[in-house]
């Protein structure tokens, strides 16, 4: 399974978790996206990383939203930003790859203009990362 597919799975799993009116476990959400007995280890790492670091990620994202509140963003954009910020801050994946993947995820799962916004926010996070 490619990392691109894994990122898509992670986005879908995180969306499922955030979209449920009742509590749903990561395992149950994953079963909706990745059919057992298959397993997507990279998606699992991303999902657990985003969930465990969510408050820190939100703190890193929020200053770059320019007159927006994180909770006012549509869910998929918020999830793409969290996932990408997690990769930027806590993995050794190349920054250009992460931003490119985020832009592609936004083009695939969000509205027509979201990718520009996401690209801008991630660029600011990179500038202020050090």
Curated annotation (Swiss-Prot):
Keyword flag RNA-binding: yes
A single cellular component GO annotation: cytosol
Keywords: RNA-binding, Transcription, Transcription antitermination, Transcription regulation
Pfam families the UniProt entry points to: NusB
MF terms (GO), sorted A to Z: RNA binding
Similarity-based family: Belongs to the NusB family.
Protein's recorded name: Transcription antitermination protein NusB
Species: Macrococcus caseolyticus (strain JCSC5402)
């Amino acid at each position: 399974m490619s990392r691109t597919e894994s990122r898509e799975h992670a986005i879908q799993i995180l969306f499922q978790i955030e979209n449920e009116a009742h509590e749903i476990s990561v395992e149950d959400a994953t079963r909706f996206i990745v059919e057992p007995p298959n397993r997507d280890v990279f998606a699992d790492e991303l999902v657990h990383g985003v969930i465990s670091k969510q408050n820190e990620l939100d703190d890193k994202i929020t200053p770059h939203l320019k007159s927006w509140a994180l909770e006012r963003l549509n869910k998929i954009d918020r999830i793409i930003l969290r996932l990408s910020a997690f990769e930027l801050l806590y993995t050794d994946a190349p920054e250009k790859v992460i931003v490119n993947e985020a832009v592609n995820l936004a083009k695939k799962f969000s509205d027509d203009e979201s990718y520009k916004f996401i690209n801008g926010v991630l660029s600011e996070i990179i500038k202020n990362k050090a």
